[in-house]
């Protein structure tokens, strides 16, 4: 997914974001106001990735395939599509988003442009689930739940090139930092609640 990918919002939240972009672009044209549009991946902070519902069987029981697997004990879900590919998602740590916003501030070459901001790379479920299992001591359940798989990445090449955007927080770093934050350790993590 890059800046030229057609915007096709599904749901009210996505529609509100698309409409806001259009309003900003219109205002920029009519009033000459310099505007830069930053499109964020799903933003997580303060260890929110640790509680991500799609990682836990107990939180995904609304899916009939997964509900049948519930035996009363938590399991981490290593979800894959019908071809056996682990799900893939591209998220962003709030620290990288703050960095991206800072990179865009005052950069004339960014005026009138749209940029994707996300973490350094997308993650696959196996990357996240194996690390979570090791750290939380929760067993893994490998499942192909059917339906539309989660499998996408954002292209952040333009933001890297034009803005100097250099995200640092991959999924493993987000998990490790989130757990350290929960233990009360001194981290640079940003609370989001």
Go through each PLM region and give its residues.
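Catalytic loop of short-chain dehydrogenase/reductase
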Residues: 1-14, 44-56, 66-69, 78, ...
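Glycine/proline-rich active-site loop of Rossmann-fold NAD(P)-dependent oxidoreductases
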Residues: 18, 30-33, 45-66, 103-115, ...
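Conserved SDR Rossmann-fold cofactor-binding beta-strand/turn motif
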Residues: 37-44
């Amino acid at each position: 997914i890059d800046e030229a990918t057609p915007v096709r919002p599904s749901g009210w939240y996505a529609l509100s974001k698309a409409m806001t972009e259009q309003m900003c672009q219109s205002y920029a044209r009519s009033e000459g106001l310099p505007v830069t549009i930053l499109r964020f991946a799903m933003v997580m902070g303060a260890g929110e990735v640790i509680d991500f519902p799609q990682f836990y069987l107990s939180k995904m029981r609304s899916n009939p395939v997964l509900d049948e697997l519930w035996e009363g004990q938590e399991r981490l879900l290593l979800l894959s599509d019908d071809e056996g590919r682990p799900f893939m998602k591209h998220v962003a740590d709030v620290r990288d988003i703050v960095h991206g916003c800072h990179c865009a501030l005052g950069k004339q070459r960014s005026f009138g442009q749209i940029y994707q901001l996300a973490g350094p790379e997308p993650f696959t479920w196996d990357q996240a689930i194996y690390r979570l299992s090791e750290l939380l001591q929760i067993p893994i359940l490998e499942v192909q739940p059917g339906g539309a798989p989660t499998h996408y990445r954002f292209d952040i090449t333009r933001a890297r090139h034009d803005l100097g955007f250099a995200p640092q927080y991959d999924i493993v770093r987000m998990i490790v930092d989130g757990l350290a934050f929960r233990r009360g350790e001194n981290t640079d993590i940003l609370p989001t609640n």
